[in-house]
């Protein structure tokens, strides 16, 4: 963990830690060259030149993305045994924080508005050549600003779709996921495609609309294999404000 006031690249001064996950740590930092606050994502350096090429490829991939729901990637570097992405700092609260503080489901109209924005973003990502997958969509990675804009964060897991990407990106980007929101194929390391992001978005919306964490895909699969009912209850049974048509869309998105 980097201590406050640590300076990297003679430029970025650490202010404090914003979050920590299975694949890295995110810090708030001051870019002293332009006097602007940025977010620094740190991950451990892998072994050899291959890892360096992977990092440069992934960072270049992210830096070329331009969408209003994505924080901009502005710089990247390696220092002290770690790789760093320098990203636009987004002020606001993530949806897991907001849901926990609220203690009740969000209103259906609000969730559908967020869903439309994220689906538009996923269309942008999935239609790129090669297609880009996020692979860790969840409430904690969606941040709402004071202007009520939504941003999808934590692209340390982003990768091109299998078979349409530099091979070096595959292993690097498979290092982590969040079980509650991950599709079965990702949990079993069987490869992912655009449908995997849609499963994760469906699981995220399920949580936001019910205030109940969704049953994970592996547990659901085992229950179904054992001839037992799917433990994932329909959304409209948990929240009567959700129309059956919306519940059906989420059920299809989260199909095992």
Predicted regions and their residues:
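Activation segment signature within eukaryotic-like protein kinase domains
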Residues: 114-115
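AlphaC helix of the eukaryotic protein kinase fold
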Residues: 42-64
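Conserved N-lobe loop of protein kinases adjacent to the ATP-binding glycine-rich P-loop
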Residues: 30-37
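Conserved short submotifs of the Hanks-type protein kinase catalytic core
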Residues: 80-94, 98
């Amino acid at each position: 963990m980097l201590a406050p006031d640590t300076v990297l690249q003679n430029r970025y001064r650490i202010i404090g830690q914003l979050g920590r996950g299975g694949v890295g740590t995110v810090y708030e930092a001051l870019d002293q060259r332009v006097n602007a606050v940025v977010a620094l994502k740190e991950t451990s350096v892998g072994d050899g030149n291959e890892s360096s090429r992977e990092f440069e490829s992934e960072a270049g991939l992210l830096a070329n993305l331009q969408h209003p729901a994505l924080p901009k990637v502005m710089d990247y570097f390696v220092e002290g045994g770690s790789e760093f992405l320098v990203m636009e700092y987004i002020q606001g609260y993530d949806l897991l924080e907001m849901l926990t503080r609220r203690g009740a489901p969000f209103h259906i109209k609000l969730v559908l508005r967020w869903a439309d924005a994220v689906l538009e973003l996923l269309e942008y990502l999935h239609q790129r050549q090669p297609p880009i997958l996020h692979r860790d969509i969840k409430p904690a990675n969606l941040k709402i600003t004071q202007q009520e804009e939504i941003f999808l964060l934590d692209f340390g897991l982003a990768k091109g779709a299998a078979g349409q990407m530099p091979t070096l990106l595959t292993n690097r980007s498979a290092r982590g996921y969040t079980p509650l929101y991950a599709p079965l194929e990702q949990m079993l390391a069987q490869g992912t495609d655009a449908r995997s992001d849609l499963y994760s978005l469906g699981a995220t919306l399920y949580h936001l609309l019910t205030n109940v964490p969704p049953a994970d895909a592996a547990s659901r699969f085992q229950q179904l294999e054992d001839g037992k009912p799917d433990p994932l209850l329909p959304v409209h049974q948990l929240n009567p404000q959700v129309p059956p048509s919306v519940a059906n869309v989420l059920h299809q998105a989260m199909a095992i």
